[in-house]
Amino acid sequence: MDTPTPNITNEALTVRGKERYRSGVLEYRKMGYWEPDYEPKITDVISLFRITPQDGVDPVEAAAAVAGESSTATWTVVWTDRLTACEKYRAKAYRVDPVPNAPGQYFAYIAYDLALFEPGSIANLTASIIGNVFGFKPLKALRLEDMRLPVAYVKTFDGPATGIVVERERLDKFGRPLLGATVKPKLGLSGRNYGRVVYEALKGGLDFTKDDENINSQPFMHWRDRFLYCMEAVNKAQAATGEVKGTYLNVTAGTMEDMYERASFAHELGSSIIMIDLVIGYTAIQSMSKWARKHDMILHLHRAGHGTYTRHKTHGVSFRVISKWMRLAGVDHIHAGTVVGKLEGDPLTTRGFYDILREDYNETRYEHGIFFDQDWAGTRKVMPVASGGIHAGQMHQLLHHLGEDVVLQFGGGTIGHPQGIAAGAMANRVALEAMILARNEGRDYLAEGPQILNDAARHCLPLRQALDTWGEVTFNYASTDTPDFVPTAMPAY
């Protein structure tokens, strides 16, 4: 019996009950990348994009194009699609909402089958989600606002080796934020003078000091000298205070071999923590996380470079997404904003970053910029770090906005103290202890904060001097990244 000839039309060819398009260029929505009735599976990776189509480009077609270009599509129909389970592997845009008060911008929800991604690889995930699609001409701008990572995918990553609870147990410090300071000036000090700064700050009351993002191994100070002098300072400060202390030794370098060498030397010297920069890349971050886990060390990540793609509201990647990726990658610390400091940080948006890093389960909170429930499936928590333009006079605000599971990094607010580094450290420690005591007594420490600090300063001259020096310093600039969200009653396309 002859096989019936398939019904051929000008637009499509039917083969075994499936629709296959002729060669040529078709709209993405007609190629299967727009499915408004699609119900995401529990195992799907879901991305929320803010899309700004070019003039005349339909937002649904733009969303379908993003789905296609971030998964299986190219600019024309290819017959080799039929050699794959293309219906499974195509990403599916299933919802498009206008962004409130932002004409021409839309939130596009896109689901990806889990089989599209290599287990345990941030590099592979990002090659699709933020790959070529970000240069796509039909879009004026594209921003990845949030992601829902399924448990089946989360469990392919180790996550932080230490996490908040274990770090506190190692330090034997509970019930308050940890205190730190970045050594200043960040560049130019000799190894010996650098070590003196570390000792004075730790002896004065801080828990940590740290290298800044761009101190590696320059002509004025070789990395090995810095490590030696810093660890000598840590050991002396521990002996003088009876407390566990630490300093973040930046092992960032030009090659993985150099980073491993520096990390190994820090481990030999007895350091409990090493530091890397975000700019080393996702694969290098995961590699250093694996090394830190093997050697039982805390891994601190400085988010150097993030502002190049997280700060612009319509194009790039939100830092809430970077926070999720870094929790998967396995860092123990990450800089996550201060709210009141000198760096970009809308209060509600910043709280959303902290929620992602510190909660076992993130519930949808549109006001914090969190668009999806996220189950971390037992992945350890990341300790957020607040740094950049903060000082003792803001202690009540910092505690209110950021909570107690955070490292407060007072760089200039320690080293710039008029009576010296140790006095600056003491001022910060006394301010923190006074605020924690007020909180534990049930006082409204946010409203009473200035009075609490002034009362404590009556018995602590360094705190009095800190308040007199910086008490009126603020950085009140409008944030460029605020949590736009779609009310549940707003109709979708």
Curated annotation (Swiss-Prot):
Its EC number is 4.1.1.39. GO terms for biological process: reductive pentose-phosphate cycle. The basic functional RuBisCO is composed of a large chain homodimer in a 'head-to-tail' conformation. In form I RuBisCO this homodimer is arranged in a barrel-like tetramer with the small subunits forming a tetrameric 'cap' on each end of the 'barrel'. Binds 1 Mg(2+) ion per subunit. Substrate binds at residues 132, 182, 186, 303, 335, 387. Heterohexadecamer of 8 large chains and 8 small chains. Disulfide bonds: none annotated. It catalyses: 2 (2R)-3-phosphoglycerate + 2 H(+) = D-ribulose 1,5-bisphosphate + CO2 + H2O; D-ribulose 1,5-bisphosphate + O2 = 2-phosphoglycolate + (2R)-3-phosphoglycerate + 2 H(+). This is Ribulose bisphosphate carboxylase large chain. Belongs to the RuBisCO large chain family. Type I subfamily. The keyword NAD does not apply. Mg(2+) binds at residues 210, 212-213. The active site is at 184 (proton acceptor), 302 (proton acceptor). It is an enzyme of class 4 (lyase). One of its GO terms (molecular function) is monooxygenase activity. It comes from the Bacteria. The record marks 342 as: Transition state stabilizer. Its cofactor is Mg(2+). It comes from Acidiphilium cryptum (strain JF-5). RuBisCO catalyzes two reactions: the carboxylation of D-ribulose 1,5-bisphosphate, the primary event in carbon dioxide fixation, as well as the oxidative fragmentation of the pentose substrate. Both reactions occur simultaneously and in competition at the same active site. The modification N6-carboxylysine is found at residue 210.
